[in-house]
A protein has these predicted regions:
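FAD-binding subdomain of flavoenzyme oxidoreductases
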Residues: 1-123, 127-129, 337-343
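Activity-critical C-terminal alpha-helical subdomain
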Residues: 217, 316, 321-343
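Short acidic-hydrophobic sequence patches enriched in Asp/Glu that either
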Residues: 5-7, 179, 285-289, 322-329
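A short, flexible low-complexity segment enriched in Lys/Arg and Gly/Pro that occurs
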Residues: 43, 47-75, 236-245, 249, ...
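C-terminal substrate-recognition/cap domain of FAD-linked oxidoreductases
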Residues: 80-288, 294-296, 300-301, 311-314
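Generic recognition of well-ordered alpha-helical segments
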Residues: 11-12, 89, 292, 329-332
Length: 343
């Protein structure tokens, strides 16, 4: 939440378009060749559909679902916005130029047991107010699996449905400790109940999704697959407690292993659930599962693709988020870039 979406950090890229031409796109360049033709098709389309796009613009800033057509800027930035998250469906991206942020050498993570979901929103707001760098959440299932297969790696709390890992960073170690101390004193919980992680060793182990997948593999002896179609959900921070309640109510009816995690500072939530790929109704079960999860998200006017910039990651379910008019615009954008459906 501190740094926004990946789209905001891209300064330029090199892309191979449908004709095989390679073009470098940055702010200020003048499109030429095939890229000029694409721009001449895209710009009038977006101008014509301004009303429809404004009406369907995601309410949540970090929602990356679909081609990013919401930016009102004029020029090459429009093309960059569309390419980021297109997952190779508009052009083949061969290089990317990112903006970077200075590395802050010192970090400290405060581990907070959340006894009640109703408290999550207030804890998140306190952490954001005290300039935390990141806020990661994991549930009791994640914690128990981690403790079982990697004892002492993750902080363990008894009878705690959710844990928040709030990370602060700074260039100066002394100032970092002062910031963390001030933050902890603002929390509505006794300090002795909190735990601290110095540095990034533990976080670098547990934050990658591969860590959770490995826990599932060990628990199920690789007889079930961790399904991640419900990764990247996003709702407002205010709605997180009731959203989690509705998710849990549904997930508990499945009788399956699941875990809820997420970079919760912006309302990002990811659900990983185990399914048997050899099951008779495997495909049907996955489809019903996705439909149920995304229906809950829709009830909260949330988004279904908040991971990185993967705008088309939930392509079969875009109709859960956008109406037919918007989906038609997406198709026209695709046709402008790749009329022969080469990509």
């Amino acid at each position: 939440f501190t740094h926004g979406t990946i789209r905001e950090w891209i300064e330029g890229m090199t892309v191979v378009v449908d004709t095989g031409e390679e073009h470098k796109i940055t702010d200020g360049i003048t499109p030429s060749g095939r890229l000029l033709g694409i721009y001449q098709n895209v710009f009038p389309l977006l101008t014509k559909e301004t009303g429809a796009l404004r009406a369907s613009k995601p309410e949540l800033h970090d929602d990356a679902t679909g081609y990013n057509l919401w930016n009102t800027s004029i020029g090459p930035r429009q093309l960059l916005d569309q390419l980021v998250g297109s997952e190779g469906t508009l052009g083949i991206i061969t290089s990317v130029t990112f903006r970077i942020t200075p590395h802050k050498e010192h970090s400290m993570t405060t581990c907070i047991p959340i006894a009640s979901k109703e408290l999550l929103s207030s804890y998140i707001e306190i952490a954001k107010h005290h300039k935390s760098e990141s806020i990661f959440m994991y549930d009791e299932g994640f914690m128990q699996l981690s403790e079982r297969y990697h004892p002492t790696l993750t902080p363990f709390f008894v009878d705690t449905p959710y844990i928040l890992l709030v990370t602060h960073t700074h260039f100066d170690k002394e100032k970092l400790h002062h910031t963390v101390k001030t933050f902890r004193s603002a929390l509505p919980i006794e300090d002795y109940l909190l735990k601290t992680l110095e540095g990034v060793h533990t976080l670098s182990r547990i934050l990658p999704t591969s860590f959770l997948y490995s826990l599932f593999d060990m628990y199920t002896s690789k007889t079930q697959l961790p399904i991640t179609i419900a990764n990247g959900l996003i709702v407002t921070v205010h709605d997180i407690p009731s959203f989690l309640y509705d998710l849990e109510e549904y997930l508990n009816t499945l009788g399956r292993l699941y875990s809820i995690t997420g970079n919760i500072g912006s309302g990002h939530i990811s659900i990983t659930t185990a399914f048997d790929p050899q099951g008779r109704d495997y495909s049907k079960d996955i489809s019903a599962y996705a439909s149920s999860i995304f229906s809950i998200v829709k009830n909260y006017k949330g988004g279904i693709s908040a991971v990185s910039g993967e705008g088309l990651a939930r392509t079969p379910y875009l109709s859960y988020v956008y109406n037919d008019a918007t989906l038609s615009i997406f198709r026209k954008i695709k046709e402008a870039w790749d009329p022969l459906s080469i990509l």
